[in-house]
């Protein structure tokens, strides 16, 4: 199983292609600063605009770089086509990913029964652990707690959910109603509250910039030192907020470019760089922090 501190990796581009040299460097930085896992080709990795070949190559590279370290790979394998999700899941398993992150199918807005059948099909196609991913603001559909409970009972390898609905009532309800399904934060602004409610980790956007701080915040909480965790969470508050001033991953890539972690600032359309106003705000907030190489 994959728990603890994880970063939802960005995908760097150069001249409209994936910059794998920089990608490897960024993953090695995650290893250096004590993260427990990296998460390639999720929302932050612009998976929606990667080709199948690029998607698979990103997983392969992440697995290769992390091999031999303590850092695991939670590979993005989500799709709004169940057959495509199964294909990505099987590929990730074959190349050595430790677990899968599967977002709810987007755009086609399945019913709860459709979600159940989708996830069951993906989970039954593989042997490695599967983490559900609930982000209704992106997908237009939310996994109901009863559906998550049914999936946990029906599929032994569905072990956790990344919760990014932003509703603390759901977080508390998950702990009470589905205690055998691990809960992880999918939103940096509520990392601490979720960890304080028996969360088992975080999947962080901010961790791309501040892996050591996110690792420390998470590890302190998991060790029961909530005061230390809270202190770090408070220090990161302004950064967590500004990194969502526009659609993720637009601000995080801009911040990484300004911090010298990216060679250039490039997105795949329809994503574009931040507005001049937001770029200035990101720069202003970034100057308050020290970004380690």
UniProtKB/Swiss-Prot annotation:
The keyword Cytoplasm applies. Its EC number is 4.3.3.7. InterPro entries: Aldolase_TIM, DapA, DapA-like, Schiff_base-form_aldolases_AS. Keywords: Amino-acid biosynthesis, Cytoplasm, Diaminopimelate biosynthesis, Lyase, Lysine biosynthesis, Schiff base. The active site is at residues 133, 162. Pyruvate binds at residues 44, 203. Transmembrane segments: none annotated. GO terms for cellular component: cytosol. One of its GO terms (molecular function) is 4-hydroxy-tetrahydrodipicolinate synthase activity. It is an enzyme of class 4 (lyase). Belongs to the DapA family. HAMAP family: DapA. Catalyzes the condensation of (S)-aspartate-beta-semialdehyde [(S)-ASA] and pyruvate to 4-hydroxy-tetrahydrodipicolinate (HTPA). Homotetramer; dimer of dimers. This is 4-hydroxy-tetrahydrodipicolinate synthase. It comes from Helicobacter hepaticus (strain ATCC 51449 / 3B1). The lineage of its organism: Bacteria, Pseudomonadati, Campylobacterota, Epsilonproteobacteria, Campylobacterales. The gene is dapA.
């Amino acid at each position: 199983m994959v728990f603890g501190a994880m970063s939802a990796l960005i995908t760097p581009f150069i001249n409209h292609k994936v910059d794998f040299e920089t990608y490897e460097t960024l993953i090695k930085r995650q290893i250096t600063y004590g993260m427990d896992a990296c998460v390639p080709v999720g929302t932050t990795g612009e998976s929606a605009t990667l080709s199948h070949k690029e998607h698979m190559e990103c997983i392969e590279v992440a697995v290769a770089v992390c091999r031999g370290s303590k850092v695991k790979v939670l590979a993005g394998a989500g799709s709004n086509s169940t057959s495509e999700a199964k294909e990505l899941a099987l590929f990730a398993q074959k190349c050595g990913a430790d677990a899968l992150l599967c977002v709810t199918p987007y755009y086609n807005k399945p019913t709860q029964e459709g979600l159940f059948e989708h996830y069951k099909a993906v989970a039954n196609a593989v042997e490695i652990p599967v983490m559900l991913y609930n982000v209704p603001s992106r997908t237009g559909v939310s996994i109901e707690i009863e559906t998550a409970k049914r999936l946990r009972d029906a599929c032994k390898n569905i072990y956790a959910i990344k919760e990014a609905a932003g509703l603390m009532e759901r977080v508390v309800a998950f702990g009470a109603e589905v205690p055998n399904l691990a809960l992880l934060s999918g939103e940096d602004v509520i990392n601490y509250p979720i960890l304080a409610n028996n969360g088992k980790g975080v999947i962080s956007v901010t961790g791309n910039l501040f892996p050591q701080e996110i690792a420390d915040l998470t590890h302190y909480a998991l060790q029961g030192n909530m005061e230390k965790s809270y202190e770090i969470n408070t220090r990161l508050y302004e950064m967590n907020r500004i990194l969502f001033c526009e659609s993720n991953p637009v601000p995080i890539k801009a911040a990484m470019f300004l911090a010298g972690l990216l060679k250039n600032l490039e997105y795949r359309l329809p994503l574009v760089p931040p507005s001049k106003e937001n770029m200035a705000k990101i720069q202003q907030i970034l100057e308050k922090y020290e970004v380690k190489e």
